[in-house]
UniProtKB/Swiss-Prot annotation:
Designated name of the protein: AA9 family lytic polysaccharide monooxygenase A
PANTHER family recorded: ENDO-BETA-1,4-GLUCANASE D, PUTATIVE (AFU_ORTHOLOGUE AFUA_1G12560)-RELATED
Use in biotech settings: Lignocellulose is the most abundant polymeric composite on Earth and is a recalcitrant but promising renewable substrate for industrial biotechnology applications. Together with cellobiose dehydrogenases (CDHs) an enzymatic system capable of oxidative cellulose cleavage is formed, which increases the efficiency of cellulases and put LPMOs at focus of biofuel research.
Lineage: Eukaryota, Fungi, Dikarya, Ascomycota, Pezizomycotina
Family affiliation: Belongs to the polysaccharide monooxygenase AA9 family.
């Protein structure tokens, strides 16, 4: 009985160290869980994706091809916030990507396959070269990104991604926590140069320097985010 209880407690502790992104908050309007965000496979376990060649690295959908019930609307230049359940509990970078639904599709029907994704944000650590490396998103219960004001209006998938690097010193050790929100963007100028478009899977290799990474020792002096550079207006 004691052994069973101990195993259960360990499993619960493991789940608590993991996290999901279940809701959006736009202009103070908080969606319900998995209402504007496609429900992820880890909605219960909170566990990560670890295989960058898996289709799950795209949106981590529990039921691929099944959209979220609603599409959120945001003004170009506005901010989209994702809630984190319970919080970001591992060290690593936060990144956001967008992909525009082609003509004839909506954010609900668009699957985000192929070279359609462009990065709009990435962060990195401070304290490199010291024993006190910190990451901007650590401990956050919500994370936000500004939609480029020069983006073209239309329907998009917005992909939030946090890469946990605490076990990333071996291939397959990095943990990816991610989700895709369904958006309609209004009011953009359409002048954005999206630069390099990438696919998920395909954008990352398990041996990319920002994915296969020794966080603790020897103490790192640099960090290179995986994927393309973020776009800007």
């Amino acid at each position: 009985m004691k052994l069973t209880t101990s195993v259960a407690l360990l499993a619960a502790a493991g789940a608590q160290a993991h996290y999901t992104f279940p809701q959006t908050d736009i202009n103070g309007q908080l969606s319900g869980e998995w209402v504007t965000i496609r429900e992820t496979t880890n909605h219960y376990s909170h566990g990560p994706v670890t295989d960058v060649t898996s289709d799950q690295i795209r949106c981590y959908e529990l039921n691929p091809g099944t959209p979220a019930p609603q599409i959120a609307t945001v003004q170009a230049g506005g901010t989209v916030t994702f809630t984190v359940d319970p919080s970001i509990q591992h060290p690593g970078p936060l990144q956001f990507y967008m992909a525009k639904a082609p003509s004839g599709q909506t954010a609900a029907t668009f699957q985000g396959t192929g070279n359609v994704w462009f990065k709009i944000y990435e962060d990195g650590p401070s304290g490199l070269g010291t024993s006190n490396i910190t990451w901007p998103s650590s401990g956050k219960t919500e994370v936000s990104v500004k939609i480029p004001s020069c983006i073209a209006p239309g329907d998009y998938l917005l992909r939030v991604e946090h890469i946990a690097l605490h076990s990333a010193s071996t291939v397959g050790g990095a943990q990816f926590y991610l989700a895709c929100a369904q958006l309609t963007v209004t009011g953009g100028t359409g002048t954005l140069n999206t630069g390099e478009l990438v696919a998920f899977p395909g954008a990352y290799s398990a041996t990319d320097p920002g994915i296969l990474f020794q966080l603790y020792w020897p103490i790192p002096t640099s960090y290179t985010n995986p994927g393309p550079a973020p776009v800007s207006c």
